[in-house]
């Protein structure tokens, strides 16, 4: 542990309690273990089977991976929605000079609510309950201090946000040449489709 490694310690007796407490992950035996060892441990093996540790690590990796996918998806989609509303409201007269200087939002409030309920919720829920990669146990352990959204993912968020924002604002501009209702509908359909494709 002093060399920076993540250490798990298993034990069942009172004499194991100090080592279990010092370890990053203390594991006590549920059947043969003493109450002191169980109280000190982070995890208790109810069946006293060491193979359960491997299953628990696998489940933990899958859950963490799904949380990352869930957060990654929601950040990129919601950031795109924010940018679309902000850019169209703040710079609409420059982006769409043919619209006679009107200040507008590409999406009605009810459309934003529907987007957040349907296209954000359902795919995010599906991502959060995925079975996980089949080779998840062959992957290297992640550094304990690594953030949920790492630098690679943040670059992906920025690229996806810019792409979704640009496509939606372009569709809104095309629709605006006809009328406001068509523009809002085109922006809504484009944004919803982009978010579903992103999932």
What feature does the model see in each segment?
Residues 24-26:
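Alpha-to-beta junction loops
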């Amino acid at each position: 542990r002093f060399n920076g490694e993540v250490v798990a310690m298993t034990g069942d007796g009172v004499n194991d309690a100090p080592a279990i407490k010092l370890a990053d992950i203390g594991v006590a035996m549920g059947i043969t273990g003493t109450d002191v060892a169980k109280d000190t441990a982070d995890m208790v093996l109810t069946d006293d089977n060491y193979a359960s540790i491997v299953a628990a690590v696998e489940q933990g990796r899958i859950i963490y991976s799904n949380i990352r996918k869930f957060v990654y998806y929601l950040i990129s989609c919601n950031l795109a929605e924010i940018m679309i509303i902000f850019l169209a409201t703040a710079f609409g007269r420059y982006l769409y000079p043919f619209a006679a200087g009107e200040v507008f939002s590409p999406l009605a409030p009810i459309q934003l609510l529907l987007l957040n309920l349907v296209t954000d919720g359902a795919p995010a829920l599906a991502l959060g309950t995925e079975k996980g990669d089949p080779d998840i146990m062959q992957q290297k352990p992640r550094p304990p201090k690594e953030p949920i959204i790492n630098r690679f993912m943040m670059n992906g968020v920025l690229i996806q946000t810019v792409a979704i924002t640009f496509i939606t604002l372009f569709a809104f501009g095309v629709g605006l040449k006809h009328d406001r209702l068509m523009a809002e509908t085109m922006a809504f359909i484009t944004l919803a489709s982009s978010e579903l494709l992103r999932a």
